[in-house]
Amino acid sequence: MRIIFSIFLLFSFNFGISQNLKVVIDTSITTKHKTVIKGIELEYTAETGMQPVWNKEGTAIASLFYTYYRRDHVKNSNKRPILISFNGGPGSASVWMHMAYTGPRILKVDDEGYPVQPYGFRSNPNSILDVADIVFVNPVNTAYSRMIPNKDEELPD
């Protein structure tokens, strides 16, 4: 019984800490990659970051976590379409859109959808990155997207 209680306390403590983690808003990380789509190798840039959401007074009230896949070496990038994709949230992050069907890389799975060994990722031959850039957005309180408390530690309305 002591072991069960100790495990319960450990998980409760870790859950409480993870809910209070602060992620710096208005930051991004950029990396370069290659993938194969419809038999053609292409280079792309992946950018993840936190986008602030402001109220009418100009105060940041939330931060949205996003991942932006941008195809490199495009002649007229100003006219390139952008697909914005998001799950309903909260509780359902955009990870399955990234890693299951739309993103440039997908999980290694068999025909029935079960993971295969060695675990990992492979190029997504059906990604739309060849024709449009993709932005995945996690709604507030999903994944890393969060409301930002005010100076009194109260959440905005």
Regions found by a protein language model. Name each.
Residues 14, 38, 50, 141-143:
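Generic hydrophobic/packing signal
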Residues 19-82, 100:
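Catalytic-loop region of hydrolases
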